[in-house]
Amino acid sequence: MHIDLNSDLGESLGAWRMGDDAAMLGIVTSANVACGFHAGDAAGILATLRGAKERGVAVGAHVAYRDLAGFGRRNMDVASADLVADVIYQIGALQGLATAAGTRVTYVKPHGALYNTIARDARQARDVIAAIRAIDASLALVVLAGSPLERWAADAGLRVVAEAFADRAYTPQGTLVSRREPGAVLHDAGEVARRMLQLVREGTVRAIDGSTTRVRADSICVHGDSPGAVDMARAVRGALEREGIALRPFA
């Protein structure tokens, strides 16, 4: 039995620091590296890529809407031609930096509002899929587990990686509880570790109403930019390893 742990990295911008990339690279098996549209600068991104190379961590393009001011968390109605070009641009930029760092980009994980939108918006989903196919159809696409995007991407011939979130609550229907709702974000590292162990071993999680819901995931996202993020990620990894579950990248 095995699972991947991923985290969003390379998001520091100039004097503004975000997360502890060095620590997280010692925990995760895949790094979703910012591409400069929602966060990250070239020098910082390159440093993160070099760290990933040294640690044997897989690299993915964390593509986003063009939204530095909103950290990529604002919904945008982007024209198809623009969205396709923006995604191609971001992947290409990261591929260049990855080559310089001695590694390569093996997957794409959209960020923030783009991630949430394409999970259910067919038009923008098609645009992102088209962009990936245009630049490198071998790249895997990380998607929200159980979302329509799983089927859309698979039907388009992409390799699909279903993702669960370690620190997020789930509805009885297996979807994420909105961040606007109380209890949507979990902060107890021990609880989070136990939940992820259940997810990997049984394919289920305890929903916010106390029921059990099914979630099939190939990768678990452990956020690196929240308070206590490193300790939580370590707790998740430790719990899995103690139960003999191997941690390895999906790509």
From Swiss-Prot:
The answer to whether keyword Translocase applies is no
Report the EC number(s), separated by commas if there are several.
3.5.2.9
- Do you know which CDD domains this protein is assigned to? LamB_YcsF_like
Please name the InterPro entries in this protein's record: Glyco_hydro/deAcase_b/a-brl, LamB/YcsF/PxpA-like
Q: Which GO terms describe its biological process?
A: carbohydrate metabolic process
Q: What class of enzyme is it?
A: hydrolase
Any Pfam family: LamB_YcsF
Q: What domain of life does the UniProt record list for this protein's source?
A: Bacteria
Q: Which reaction does it catalyse?
A: 5-oxo-L-proline + ATP + 2 H2O = L-glutamate + ADP + phosphate + H(+)
Q: What does this protein do?
A: Catalyzes the cleavage of 5-oxoproline to form L-glutamate coupled to the hydrolysis of ATP to ADP and inorganic phosphate.
Q: How does it assemble?
A: Forms a complex composed of PxpA, PxpB and PxpC.
The record ties this protein, via PANTHER family, to: 5-OXOPROLINASE SUBUNIT A, UNCHARACTERIZED PROTEIN YBGL-RELATED
Supply the name of the protein.
5-oxoprolinase subunit A
Q: Give the organism the record lists.
A: Paracidovorax citrulli (strain AAC00-1)
